[in-house]
Design a protein with these regions (language model features):
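Cleavable N-terminal export/targeting peptides
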Residues: 1-26, 341-353
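Subset of outer-membrane beta-barrel
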Residues: 25-353
Length: 353
């Protein structure tokens, strides 16, 4: 009896998690080297780097579940002159998949930003990002009858009809927009601090108008992407330690609102310009009455190349703070970044020494 009750509770909870994963919330890129560009179209070209980025994010749950995300992007930052106010151009590819039933979502997107320099120390960029989403389920991965699937819960005998419905391959055209800015100001000991801030909106287009599906409006309503609002604020304070060791301490706050899902993440990163960064963060996820906490640890390594080229390697580990719940998953993300050109910073240099 006790086992049956636990099974019912597990099925109910996992179905709740599925509804969050597949309908209510987008996959988040967790590493500082990538989260700005994948979370705000206006950040395209803002850091002045032209290069290529690849990454993978994998989640391990309390039940046997393998949820993976793959990220690829290319960034190009325009020079200050003869660009008609353009900031940068970025291309994105993202693939989310749950391997036990092969639920796949693919994203193809391009972001273009325009720059407005309000003063010597303040610059703003606005950006647009048209996107294509492709969603599908592999029906051969589903087993009918009394199967307890780790992602979908219990698969019932009525699944043939549901399987033919969800196996529909859906293609979505969507649009995102954002604004990103930075204000620099002088502080003591010949350094420059900066305040960065951004706001973005994803899934602007009405979903029932953006889907191209064999099953028409019914499939569109079932597979809708809820509008997502994201905000980001960070403060970077320079610390020159001598011997040309320049470090920056950056506390940050990120907020995401998507349908009934709320995310609040805050933390701090300590970066050395030549070597890399280390960071620590805490994220709270809220879905109606459900609240989940996650601890994030960030590591980054800079590998200099030529004069204006080099490599970056990023790693993030996410560990749940609420152990013992069904919603516990440890995620690992690894990313590699290669840049071949550095455009001069939009504002003044951070260190004078």
């Amino acid at each position: 009896m006790c086992v049956g009750i636990r099974l019912i509770i597990s099925v109910t909870f996992l179905l709740l998690v599925v509804s969050v994963r597949l309908q209510a919330q987008d996959t988040k890129v967790s590493h500082p080297f990538m989260w700005k560009s994948f979370n705000n179209p206006a950040y395209s070209g803002f850091d002045g780097l032209a290069g290529v980025n690849i990454g993978m994010q994998r989640s391990y749950w309390s039940k046997p579940l393998d949820f993976r995300s793959y990220f690829v992007s290319a960034d190009y930052a325009f020079q200050e002159k003869r660009t008609f106010g353009l900031g940068g151009l970025s291309l994105f590819y993202q693939r989310d998949q749950e391997s036990s039933v092969m639920y796949v979502t693919q994203l193809f997107a391009a972001a273009l930003s325009a720059r407005v320099k309000l003063s010597r120390s303040t610059v703003l960029q606005v950006g647009l990002q048209p996107s294509l989403y492709c969603k599908s389920v592999d029906p051969s991965k589903l087993t009918l009858g009394d199967q307890f699937d780790p992602f979908y819960g219990q698969i019932l005998d009525i699944s043939p009809e549901l399987m033919s419905f969800y196996a529909d391959k859906v293609t979505i055209f969507d649009m995102a927009a954002g604004i990103y800015g930075q204000t620099d100001f002088n502080v003591a000991w010949h350094g420059v601090a900066s305040l960065e801030y951004g706001f973005s909106v994803y899934h602007i287009i009405e979903s029932t108008q953006s889907f191209l599906s064999e099953h028409g409006s019914a499939s569109s309503e079932e597979n809708l992407l809820n509008r997502r609002y994201s905000g980001y604020v960070s403060y970077a304070h320079p610390f020159a330690l001598g011997n040309q060791i320049n470090t920056v301490l950056s506390p940050y706050v990120m907020v995401d609102v998507q349908s009934v899902m709320r995310n609040l993440q805050f933390g701090v990163c300590w970066e050395e310009e030549r070597f890399g960064l280390i960071g620590l963060g805490v994220r709270g996820d809220q879905f109606e009455g459900l609240q989940v906490g996650t601890l994030l640890v960030h590591l980054g390594v800079n590998i200099p190349g030529g004069r204006d080229s080099g490599w970056k390697i990023g790693y993030t580990c996410e560990v749940p703070t609420h152990q013992g719940t069904m919603y516990q998953n440890t995620s690992h993300s690894l990313s590699l970044h290669w840049y071949y050109r550095i455009v001069p910073k939009r504002c003044i240099q951070r260190f004078d020494n």
